Amino acid sequence: MSASLGSLRQDHADKAVRAPSRREFFRTVSLAGAAVGLGGARALSQIASPPPRDKALIAITLDLEMARNFPRWEDTHWDYEKGNLNAEAKRYSLEAARRVKAHGGVIHFFAVGQVFEQENVDWLKELNQNGHPIGNHTYDHVFVLATKPEDIQYRFKRAPWLIEGKTPAQVIRENIQLCTEAMRTRLGFSPAGFRTPGGFLDGLNGRPDVQQMMLDCGFKWVSCKYPAHPYGNPGEPATKEVLDGIVKAQADAQPFVYPTGLVDVPMSPISDIGAFRNARWKLDDFLRAIRLGVEWAIERRAVFDLLSHPSVLYPNDPDFRVVELVCDLVKQAGDRAAIVDLDTIAKRVAAAPR
């Protein structure tokens, strides 16, 4: 057992280094945050030499946030405390990372900034030290396409005074920058890329303002698009038609470049939330869908980006069958596939002729 994994069971027993209070932290960010908007985050997402195009690139991504309806269906309070990760989600993250690394791969994590308010962040440092990148998922899990204050996040709708006098664009930009500064302050390194809370059917197309915001915040690539696909009737087993529709949607989940030069590495259907909340599937149906999606990508030397959440997987897949399945499929493919992070995928698409 790792030292940080053991410490999670001690309810923040390590008092040697006091975490800054919320007031102290935001005061620090207010002084440092301007550097992000003025180019201080240029090193956040570097796109250098591309990987070869003769193999499928398979990514396993875990969003570090709590999700409504998990572990119990009546759990909805997480909407207001997305980053208050419980011990089970942290342990799941560490063990999933250990398993994937043992197979020669990495997991790309995305954390909401609220996570860095927790007293013990050693487990996040351990993930990074073991080669697993951690990206920015905004501070409060905000809706980056919002144009009205009440649409930004549940928390701000209930407490509008927190954003009074600011435009939605200002709130969203600040929320992104706060997550970056929180990571730098608590972990000592900058985020590896950016993922939007929620996936958008058309990504950031039609929103050049948001694309430019991402570039201004120092991100050369983002993960925003999540293509449309069928779910079937909630609670019913996945039918062939539903699974065929999910496979068909993989073509719409391939990475691309916006006119602004921003790269998007989409999330591949179906996500764990889509499977266990929307479709109310059993684990075996989710495994079938993931197998078909990964096999589609391997056959075409394409990209598959598994979108999951430790807070959703630990009650639904306690034996890590999903990550083990992906690792096994890539191993069976030999030199036709590799498990990589999203930066590696972004490098390949950025280098492709357009």
Provide a role label for each language-model segment.
Residues Q153-W161, T196-A297:
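Active-site-adjacent pocket scaffolds in enzyme catalytic domains
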Residues N130-I176:
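Substrate-binding cleft of extracellular glycoside hydrolase catalytic domains
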Residues L8-G33:
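N-terminal secretory signal peptides and thylakoid transit peptides that target proteins
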